[in-house]
Structure formats: C-alpha cells, structure tokens
Amino acid sequence: LHCNAVRTSHYPQSQYFLDECDRLGLLVFTELPGWQHIGDGAWKDRACAMLREMLLQNRNHPSIILWGVRINESVDDDEFYTRTNQIAHALDPSRATSGVRYLEKSHLLEDVYAYNDFSHNGSNAGAKRKKDVTPDLSKALLISECNGHMYPTKSCDDAPHRQEHALRHARGLDAAYADGEHAGCFGWCMFDYATHKDFGSGDRICYHGVLDSFRNPKLA
C-alpha cells in the first residue's frame, strides 16, 4: 500500500504487531480502547488504568509516534481528558498526544488535533481546511479517518464504482498533502470487517476497506 504510518483504530494491538512495525519502520498512532461511550467515575478510573498499562507496555517501541488519549469519537470531557493527557506526558514526555474526534473545534487539550474528515462527497474539496476544523492553528492537524463509510465498495462492484472508490481516496490524500496544513492523513480503512446488524450494508459487513476481508486488494 506504500503507507508509512498506521493507526491502530481504536484499540491497542498485539505486541507482535508492534514488533513488526518496529522492524519495518512503520510509524504507529496507538490509542486508548473505546468508541464514543464515556462512563461513570469508576469507568473513567479503569480507562486511566488501561492507558497507563498501554504506555508502560509499549513506550519502548520506536515505531510509536503518537498516543491517543481520548475515547475515539467521544464528546468533550475536559476533566477526564486533562487527566489522561497528564498520564501520557508523565509516563512518556518524549511523545505527543492526540485524540480522535468527529467534532470541529472541540476543546484541544492534547498536542495534535486528530479529526475524522468525511466531508468529501465526490464533487467537493477532498478535505476541510485547517482553519475550519481546529481551534488552535499553532498545533498540528491530523486526518485520522477519511472516505470509509461515505462510499462503501465491494470487490464485486462494477468497474466505475470501484474506480470512484480509488479516486475518492486519492482526492483526500491530495487535499491533505497539497495545502501544507495537515500533518498527515489516514484513510478509513485497511480491510472490510464484520459488524452488527444495524451497521454496514445489511449483511453484517462494513465494506469500507481498500482490501476485502480476505486481504484481496481493491482498486483503491
């Protein structure tokens, strides 16, 4: 795929995966586990404990460049995320922190604003401008997801559909790298994956990958 970085989205991976990233020189953005939900005080305590475990287990992996200290796609919670950010910086002051958002101009307590940019519809700009997304222009903006569910594509779809899928990924990358405002861009996502009945294409599969579930490449 000619990628130079991977986001673990949004759960820590096996040590063997990180070992291979170290060997290959593949840069890693790894994250606190979770998706959208923030629980009560006991839940937050457990999340902080898991964050500590993740850092202590993995901070000696040279491939890791960014710690995700927010629950993926969650709302702002300044008290909780001040706490997680402080934990990460205390245990590893050498690396930057971030947290993946679907929100524009949410409270930025970390070092890098990570944003899921699903704005491209095939006929508009490939990505949003930095000034429209982050509240602090002095800090880096990273596209943590793009395309994905906006244009699900099966390996068996017709050629025009598969071609448009590839072009949408290309437009997102072009927009992110052309303006000099983005620190990088992660597409969503590498593989098609199983899901629950209320999500995806009705057959319990999300066809969001640039490869299918069996690791066969699509045009993208």
Regions found by a protein language model. Name each.
Residues 5-219:
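Substrate-binding/catalytic cleft of secreted carbohydrate-active enzymes
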Residues 2:
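Phosphate-binding active sites in nucleotide-utilizing proteins
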